[in-house]
Amino acid sequence: MPAMTPAFRRADLTGFLRTYGAALILLLAAMLAWQPAQAQLRVDISGTGATQYPVAIADFAVDDTHGRALAEVIRADLTRTGQFRLINAADSGLNVDSQVAHDDWRAKGADFLAYGSITRGPDGRYDVRYRLADTVKKGQLDGVAFSGTEQELRRVAHQIADRIYEKITGVRGVFSTRIAYVLKRGSTYELQVADADGQNPQVALRSREPIISPSWSPDGSRLAYVSFESGKPVVYVHTLATSARIPVANFKGNNSAPAWSPDGSQLAVALTRDGLSQIYIVSAGGGSNMRRITRSPGIDTEPNFTPDGRSIIFTSDRSGGPQIYQTGLDGGDARRLTFNGGYNISPRISPDGSTLLYVARRDGAFRIASLNLSSGSETLLTDGRDDQSPSFAPNGMQVLYAAIQNGRSVLAGVSSDRRVRQTLSVLNGEIREPTWGPFTR
């Protein structure tokens, strides 16, 4: 079964669609309960950024156990970016009201110092107060208070790491965002949602057949995906908080490759209802509203809206081999975007609209590439043999994708400048089809 592989991996594209539609049927009953997953992702990191900011993260005072754990999450978040060099802050004795000895910390090599306090209130909730000092300018860069239950402290740590990252780099942090992916364990497939660091995985959907093409809504509350339980591929929209879902594309033939409009009201999808796969727009709330966008003699698939919502990027073989095109929502003439190589698929556009991300076949290997849309310059970001499903972080600084490592499917990440790489894997199972969720605050 050619599940989980791009639609353009075979030379006979029309034959692939016939095979794909016939093979991926009869989905067994899916369990839609929102429940904790049984395994955490393991993260391995290599490389460093071109610039590394020296920062000390002190254990948060008062509640030693929770304060140490809070600081460890913040340190781990910053370390994963490769952009920070951690300065030892063991036994600092700092609390949120401490006077910072800027010169002393500067002498230790720290340009920045994060510190704070955590206390448990009478209602059982924890109050977390944090400060960020600039030891060079000898001033306070940031200071804020949070409140949460014990179960919410990890989220609070991610939010603090986001603030540290943004105050120092000027770019919004993504540590409190989420990722979605498909985990295959034995004969079972699970659509899972986890924190950006791979922790706290939750099962959104479980089935005995493949789940494909998960796509986040702009507000992070819903996932669109393709399911086959009715005997044919159908696009569903799934509300994560309630596990409620509705079919939004249930037409004759294949319904596939959902992608959200920036306002969350519509989905671009690939349908074969009128013959070869073409691009359509349907309502994200269900109903009968549908509009055809492309009308080509080839196969058009893998649509994605541009950030301004005015056009769609998609894959098409109209020129022979699969390439990436852009067309307006009026369905006018499409403009070809990729010209390097004879095989480029799975387009994703950066949050600022400046960079195109895609899978490129180069020297027989499938690698993740980026294209500067202004200059036309292409960069190969990965060096694997079978890298797939690229997805930008919502700040555009990192890329998540599926890779093969030691014969198993894993999630991998690479910084947009190629300098920092990470791998997310599980002890039992294979993970694939990643998609990085949006900012939600």
Curated annotation (Swiss-Prot):
Belongs to the TolB family. InterPro entries: 6-blade_b-propeller_TolB-like, PD40, Tol-Pal_TolB, TolB_N. Residues 1-39 form the signal peptide. It is found in: Periplasm. It comes from the Bacteria. This is Tol-Pal system protein TolB. Gene3D superfamilies: TolB, C-terminal domain (2.120.10.30), TolB, N-terminal domain (3.40.50.10070). Transmembrane segments: none annotated. It comes from Bordetella parapertussis (strain 12822 / ATCC BAA-587 / NCTC 13253). The gene is tolB. Part of the Tol-Pal system, which plays a role in outer membrane invagination during cell division and is important for maintaining outer membrane integrity. GO terms for biological process: cell division; protein import. GO terms for cellular component: periplasmic space. Keywords: Cell cycle, Cell division, Periplasm, Signal.
